[in-house]
Amino acid sequence: MEGEEMKRKLCILLCGTLAAGMLTACGGKNEMTGSETNAKSTGEEETVTIWHDGDEAIMGVIEDTVNKKIADENVSIKFEKKTGLTDQLKLYGNDQANGPDMYLYAHDSLGMLAEMGILAPVTDFISADDEADLLPMTVEAGTYKDTQYVLPLYYESLLFIYNKDLWKGALPKTTDDLLSYMKENTDVDAGTYAVVNQHSTAYNVAPVINGFDGYIIDKDAKPGLDDANTIKAVEYNKKFAELMGEGDYDTCNTLFNEQKAQAIIGGPWLVSGIKDAGINYGICSLADFTLPNGKSLAPYSGVQGVGILKYAEENKKDAITSVLKALCSTEIGVALAKESNCAPANQEAYKDEEVAANEMIMAMKTTAESAEPMPNIPQMSVMWGPAESMLAAVNKSGEDVEASAEKYQEEAEAAIADMQ
């Protein structure tokens, strides 16, 4: 009997110990998932960490503006710069202890990150009403396979930048008239040009390709180098390339800054150098030029926005929701435009008097109506090589457009197949 009684007591003791252990484990889990609620209830501030690899000054503008806007919600953001951001996210995208809550980067990396399964949809946090003031093109840029993973903040595109002291008369309204002006005002032997552009760089020829309804690659990862409209576009662009000779990035910039070219097709990143060169410059949108088919030039647009790491949704959903709503605001857009000279994703920001007076920003706003977001699918990374080889073959080596298109279409298809 004593033995049976001892067994009964031992059983009770073990069961009690096991139950206590289970309660401790459940309590620990509740403490983790409820950390945000606990922080709010005790008045502690919840910090949302955002990794970036961009301009520290721009991040400072965003950080200051957001933190002022959500100060009464016990939430703040903190930017941390990480060189080689996509590689860092590959390493830490599933590491809650060492990774960020969010990241800010160019939208064209989205497909790769989404395929890794590390991102949470923006729509898990905010509604379409919250994003109602955002330019549709920028929202499209942050969408991959019908799911929005990136909230857009600002964007950029190619522009038509001209020297007001050299340009003769009014700017043309059609690309045909622009071509005529170039023929009349270009002297290759003397080294003076009307307009310079990187004609063997796919990004710089994309405005013509897109405007002709051609494409470099579509959303289904099908290369479009041999598409009939792409071929027409490259044939048409060749007329402009023939008036230039070599036109790499440095050559084009030097020609314009040394006032040997009246105009250049380039992005907002050129403006500081142009100012330093003392040039009296003007800017207009590429969308202001109409192609022979009646459509506007349609450059690619690069959009900078924020994405959310999936594990952060579990622990900081309320805090991140507050941050995203603040980032959607007109105040952020106005601050980015005024303090950083960025074209904001928020449409209401352009109603600000000072923003509306900014020629470069308003030119990009016009461009946003026809611009196409740069493809954000992973396969785009292997398309630049074949596309630019095709353009170089046509514009530098004088090869037949259709033959080159066929050759480099096959090369592109092989490169994509190798990614599988």
Task: Give each language-model segment a name.
Residues 11-15, 26-110, 292-293, 315-318, ...:
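Conserved N-terminal structural module of periplasmic/extracytoplasmic solute-binding proteins
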Residues 67, 235-316:
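Extracytoplasmic/periplasmic substrate-binding proteins
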Residues 69-134, 165, 170-173, 262-263, ...:
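Extracytoplasmic "Venus flytrap"/periplasmic binding protein-like
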Residues 90-91, 98-101, 129-165, 193-194, ...:
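A structural signal for short loop-to-beta-strand junctions that line the ligand-binding cleft
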Residues 107-158, 173, 177-179, 187-189, ...:
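Hinge/lid segment of periplasmic solute-binding proteins
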Residues 147-153, 158, 177-223, 229, ...:
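Extracytoplasmic/periplasmic solute-binding protein
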Residues 182, 220-249:
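Glycine-centered hinge/linker elements that transmit conformational signals in sensory
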Residues 337-393, 417-418:
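Long, aromatic- and glycine/proline-rich binding clefts that accommodate carbohydrate-like moieties
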